[in-house]
């Protein structure tokens, strides 16, 4: 159990940054769930909106990816 | 469908039995092999699989060194060429299996470009199709055990994303001139809000290549790292390692899905950016 305070901070920071990935999961679930809710009300319109669904998921995911990037930077680049 | 499956079960019951026995033996051999090497806990580091190595000789790695990344990128290019050249060799009215695969991929991406970016984006379809097939095959080849996943490296995906970003930006200015800047001037918003929105739009525009590249690399890399973490569990648990092996099988199925979806998402975002370049007005 050796190591210095800076390394400890690095690991704690990386773990905290990983919380952002969970937040992105909430966002992605929101997009997909709302798509499903809308699709079940009007199934005939659903097929044309799958591209929009994936774009929405990608945008929601992008911010989670920034959190992941911060975690990676803290682990390997600092 | 139901009668079909019962029929095949009746016919090939013995063959199915043999398959189950083989799978069981394979799993036991897999766990036994791990027992020897990885008895000391997580001896394999999950990130080791992304290490770039020289293929020939020793020494430092430069720009023109042939590495495992180069090899697997070349292999995915070869696969794309093989699919398209082999698939379109006959060009028959009733397509063969390879031809229908090639037609399926072509039609899928063409439809996507037309739906998302509009008809006038079709001249840029070859570029988008190339991107899609390269990423798809790089992802799928990375799922072959002991292979190397090129798209898990940000260096690879960043080049792809920067190419898209530069293409789209230059195209926007060539097609619209200074009118391309109206992309950042949201004319549907109240006048007082527009300068603030312009700053936000500008930031989000320049963040595009970052999120575009890291989304692909991050998804692929995280999935492969999870597989290796579970492999480490299987080695550490001994005979109970059968549970992580089942988990690996399930996650592998998920990774096949992710490989296809991430190629799709990369392509469809390229189409969205292209649409912004061709029609910047809000």
Curated annotation (Swiss-Prot), chain A:
Main location, first listed in the record: membrane
SUPFAM superfamilies for this protein: F1F0 ATP synthase subunit C
Keyword Transmembrane part of the UniProt annotation: yes
Chain positions of site Reversibly protonated during proton transport: 61
Keyword terms, alphabetized: ATP synthesis, Cell inner membrane, Cell membrane, CF(0), Hydrogen ion transport, Ion transport, Lipid-binding, Membrane, Transmembrane, Transmembrane helix, Transport
GO MF terms held by the record: lipid binding; proton-transporting ATP synthase activity, rotational mechanism
Pfam families per UniProt: ATP-synt_C
Subcellular localization: Cell inner membrane
Topology with respect to the bilayer: Multi-pass membrane protein
Signal peptide start-end: none
Assigned GO CC terms: plasma membrane; proton-transporting ATP synthase complex; proton-transporting two-sector ATPase complex, proton-transporting domain
The keyword Zinc-finger is assigned to this record: no
Transmembrane spans: 11-31, 53-73
Family stated for the protein in its record: Belongs to the ATPase C chain family.
Assembly and interaction partners: F-type ATPases have 2 components, F(1) - the catalytic core - and F(0) - the membrane proton channel. F(1) has five subunits: alpha(3), beta(3), gamma(1), delta(1), epsilon(1). F(0) has four main subunits: a(1), b(1), b'(1) and c(10-14). The alpha and beta chains form an alternating ring which encloses part of the gamma chain. F(1) is attached to F(0) by a central stalk formed by the gamma and epsilon chains, while a peripheral stalk is formed by the delta, b and b' chains.
PANTHER family: ATP SYNTHASE LIPID-BINDING PROTEIN, MITOCHONDRIAL (PTHR10031), ATPASE PROTEIN 9 (PTHR10031:SF0)
Function description: F(1)F(0) ATP synthase produces ATP from ADP in the presence of a proton or sodium gradient. F-type ATPases consist of two structural domains, F(1) containing the extramembraneous catalytic core and F(0) containing the membrane proton channel, linked together by a central stalk and a peripheral stalk. During catalysis, ATP synthesis in the catalytic domain of F(1) is coupled via a rotary mechanism of the central stalk subunits to proton translocation. Key component of the F(0) channel; it plays a direct role in translocation across the membrane. A homomeric c-ring of between 10-14 subunits forms the central stalk rotor element with the F(1) delta and epsilon subunits.
HAMAP family reported in the protein's UniProt record: ATP_synth_c_bact
Protein name, entry field: ATP synthase subunit c
Organism: Jannaschia sp. (strain CCS1)
The organism's taxonomic lineage, starting at the top: Bacteria, Pseudomonadati, Pseudomonadota, Alphaproteobacteria, Rhodobacterales
Name of the coding gene: atpE
